[in-house]
């Protein structure tokens, strides 16, 4: 029995609605090819916090904190012949980072 190949697509963005929207679009495209889909699986959100001094010269105790969160989703696909062709035609926005592993 042959081992089936899996495609893992990881979506990353600072905007959670953008990640969710494009995860749904990818799933809709893949469903047209009759491939098996697992996901979107939400991965842990990482929050980055940066602390800076408010004043450039004095008042070391006066600081301000900035934070942003990076949201991730994972989609696993067991592809058919047309799945990869359909995924290559898909154009994603610049706000979403896509990582594809097989």
Swiss-Prot record:
Tagged with keyword Ribonucleoprotein: yes
Family matches, as InterPro entries: Ribosomal_uS10, Ribosomal_uS10_CS, Ribosomal_uS10_dom, Ribosomal_uS10_dom_sf
Keyword Ribonucleoprotein appears in the UniProt entry: yes
Domain of life: Bacteria
Single GO biological process annotation from the record: translation
Pfam families in the record: Ribosomal_S10
GO molecular function, one term: tRNA binding
GO cellular component, one term: ribosome
Keywords: Ribonucleoprotein, Ribosomal protein
SMART domains with a match to the protein in the record: Ribosomal_S10
Coiled-coil zones: none
Similarity comment: family membership: Belongs to the universal ribosomal protein uS10 family.
Assembly and interaction partners: Part of the 30S ribosomal subunit.
PANTHER family according to UniProt: 30S RIBOSOMAL PROTEIN S10 FAMILY MEMBER (PTHR11700)
Job of this protein: Involved in the binding of tRNA to the ribosomes.
Annotated protein name in UniProt: Small ribosomal subunit protein uS10
Organism: Chlorobium phaeobacteroides (strain BS1)
